Amino acid sequence: MNTVNLKINNIPVVAPEGATILEAAHLVGIRIPTLCYLKEINAIGACRICVCEVKGARGLAAACVMPVSEGMEVFTNTPALQRYRRTTLELILSTHRTDCLSCTRSTDCELQQLCREYGVDMNRFTKKDQGYHTDASMPHLVRDNSKCILCRRCVAVCQKNQYAGVIETCERGYDTHIACAFDMPLSETACVACGQCTAVCPTAALRERDDTDKVWAALNDPTKTVIVGPAPSVRAQLGECFGMPIGTNVEGKLVAALRRLGFDQVFDVDTAADVTIMEEGTELLHRLKEGGPLPLITSCSPGWIKFCEHYYPEFVDNLSSCKSPQQMFGALIKTYYAQKAGLDPKNIVVVSVMPCTAKKFEIGREGQSAVGLPDVDVSITTRELADMIRRAGIMFPELPDEEFDPIFGIASGAGHIFGATGGVMEAALRTVAEIVTGKELARPEFQEVRGIAGIKEAEYDLAGTKVRVAVTSGLANAAKLLDRIKSGEAEYHFVEVMACPGGCVNGGGQPHQSGDVRNFTDLRSLRAAALYSEDEAMTLRKSHENPVVKELYAEYLGEPGSHLAHHILHTTYVKRGLYGKN
């Protein structure tokens, strides 16, 4: 690798050729502030917060886009630069609604943090109300342009990572704003509800719809039995909201916190993930033996499902008819559990804690009501749960570790790894391989489908049958894979798709991390590692060996793929098209 020598703040630096000033400075522990930059996604130098002085240059250079060169001398924090950044922040604030005390991102806002760092405690510039309206037309998020700073992160992630491109930069000059085409509400676009825009927004211009009031109301209603289930990835991310290191598994504290919030039963959605594998594995074997649309494509990610319905409706028949683990969880609570506990399903409120904003959309879909009631009543994100814990005065890091309640409290390691890209595929392969061969796997790991690569492929020999599989995450990668399948360039039997790059660990509802962290930390790998570590430490690592799952089928469902299982655990999809029903 070729390198260049330069100086940053009089410190000698050896940086890779082609590196930016921002990256070179990071190598020697120098932080240059940014607001718009996202590594490999949004490098446009628009916010002007990262500008530096380069000796001999005519003007200031944006560190996020300026490549280093041999002999370059850079200064990142001179008095002039401090004044420049402060003025830039004041100008940004002149068009920003500063209701910081009541803002949902207060103390978690990148703009607020930079204003604090640069001493912006008052604004010299007159504010102007640009008359923007809040768009709350979708069930999963709220868009508030009065808090937009035009960093364009959302535009970049929607176009580059997620292929959808439903938001863009409109108008010019002072009238520039982020909007959908023709200023339409999101509900009239092909938005897939993934929430990646909310994950990268540095302010509260994009945020998930807050459904915590619905949960508080249920918890305070003595006529309701309120049951909660967190998704696999939540245990690996919730700790970040309370200052714990990225990738810390807080499962025990999560359970303790949910009990202290007042939930009547604290169950594990991972158990439903094991049920998903039983149903989806059976569906795969049926299509391989009896015929059916191939490849079978997973259906756990509601953002992916909506993307397929809008952008690739020709693949809708390839989708597994299995509900997602969230929806299976709710359906089983209101059928199987209600019968065992002697409860009227009408008096049960099922709350899910998800890494995903699209789950808010999913709970309102048609075909998600096993007993004529919504399978899941309320879905909140990891961030919303953290807010509830704070509001209740619960000191999360000091909580003891507790265990899930019985019946839906035992899950396999296969269920845990659902939260990482490739996890659903690996969990399915563990079960399908043993069913087909009749032999126990020497090792349950399928390393070929692990990792954060956008597209992964593998071929396995299952009792003489060659099974080709593919795993993809991020909808732009999914589009590439589907195009290859459609053209005949690639052929698979089984495909896993997750809407969010890296899978649920990088979901739109996960804890916010600043650009400083996102640009120089492998968030996805650190978070996924917590799930894989939990799996490796378990003796129960295969879905079909879960005693709760065995009992469920023996007592109630009969067998995977039975008529009753199809009624409760399976669903249908809609070919929406780009301009069809949202």
Question: How would you label these PLM feature ranges?
Answer:
Residues 1-11:
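Eukaryote-biased recognition of intrinsically disordered, low-complexity regulatory segments
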Residues 4-5, 15-81, 85, 209-582:
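Iron-sulfur-associated redox domains of electron-transfer enzymes in respiratory
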Residues 9-11, 181-183, 233:
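Short strand-loop junctions, especially beta-strand C-caps/beta-turns
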Residues 14, 137, 147, 190, ...:
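Charged, low-complexity surface patches
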Residues 48-193, 199, 206-221, 225:
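Fe-S ferredoxin-like electron-transfer domains
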Residues 162, 201, 337-341:
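Structural motif corresponding to the C-terminal cap of alpha-helices
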